[in-house]
């Protein structure tokens, strides 16, 4: 009788350990947080305003596509952005982008990019719709301008690298 009790006790411990193991695995692999690693292309209409000394400002309104460089977050998304900055390149360029995911849900981000280091900016999520409602995110962003084939347009490659958490 003592052996049966020990066997039952051991079996209970094993089952309890399995249950706890499954619960903790689910907690860490819940899909509610992860890394952002996106790269893409951006094209926009731009307007420039200068004074007689060459000091001025620029504004733009455009869109582009993004793809995930690692993982799947944000793969095959599009972005629509508006922004502004100063010329000559002192201060920051700032703006907002709406990221549209493949399932039609969106996330809105705010960004600031130093004009003397266009690959060294920061971004953060302001909110989202659908699955991305309540999203929080932050990280690094930047761009490398490409010589435009058309006057009044800007073209660039850009990136977002950071982390996100979805509302549970």
What is each model feature region?
Residues 2-14:
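Positively charged n-region of N-terminal signal peptides that target proteins for export
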Residues 20-21:
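Short, linear, compositionally biased motifs with a strong N-terminal bias
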Residues 30-168:
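Beta-strand-enriched cores of mature, soluble protein domains
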